[in-house]
Design a protein with these regions (language model features):
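Short helix-initiation/N-cap motifs at beta->coil->alpha
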Residues: 1-5, 92-101
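Secondary-structure junction motif
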Residues: 48-49, 55, 62-83, 151-155, ...
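Short beta-strand-centered segments that line the small-molecule binding cleft or hinge
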Residues: 1-38, 42, 128-130
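Flexible hinge/capping segments at coil-to-helix
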Residues: 27-64, 68, 146, 153
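Short beta-strand-to-loop elements that line the ligand-binding cleft
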Residues: 65, 86-96
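A late-sequence structural motif
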Residues: 128-168
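A ligand-binding cleft/hinge motif common to bilobed small-molecule-binding domains
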Residues: 16-25, 78, 82, 97-127
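Hydrophobic residues within well-ordered alpha-helices
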Residues: 6-8, 58, 102-108, 143
Length: 168
């Protein structure tokens, strides 16, 4: 990815992201910040919320999901597979949070999304999480730095602020 390439070339001092393939992480340090769960979200007045929510019922509605090959997509497919479900044909595949949010807020779409991407929308009541539990503790999100290069004072100050802002 561009983040890993930028770190390895020295163009970037640090990055924050998901844990990658261990082969791609050679030469980099990884410090876990938090685990991010997968959420299934809808608009607050979505018809799904009027009855018992099951994954098979969710799959009767239009779905927005990350493209194949992404970690959120893999997590969505694992969740569905555990319940004997598959993504409906014709689901929207996009990395655009703004498009996904718009489809979910304005229409009856169900969005499979990492929790951090919709934290504020959930808190403000713009979106509602369906009562569906995703498998595992969540995706590891952390700080990436180069093994062979000390961080500048500014980068160290930034990392200190990031660490202090993380919940225990």
């Amino acid at each position: 990815t561009m983040l890993l390439a930028g770190l390895k070339s020295g163009e970037l001092d640090l990055g924050i992201g998901r844990m990658s393939d261990p082969e791609l992480m050679s030469g980099l340090n990884y410090e876990l910040l938090f685990l991010e769960s997968l959420k299934l979200v809808v608009r607050p007045n979505h018809p799904l919320l009027q009855d018992t929510v099951t994954l098979s019922r969710v799959m009767e509605w239009p779905v927005v999901v990350s493209p194949k090959g992404t970690v959120p997509r893999q997590n969505a497919e694992a969740l569905l597979q555990m319940q004997g479900c598959t993504l409906p044909s014709g689901c929207i595949e996009t990395l655009s949070a703004s498009l996904s949010r718009q489809l979910t807020v304005d229409y009856d779409y169900v969005w499979f999304v990492p929790s951090g991407a919709v934290k504020d929308d959930l808190r403000r009541g713009v979106l509602t999480a369906l009562p569906v539990t995703s498998p595992g503790a969540g995706e590891p999100i952390g700080i990436l730095t180069r093994v062979d290069a000390p961080l500048s004072e500014g980068a160290q100050t930034l990392l200190s602020a990031i660490r202090k802002s993380m919940p225990l």
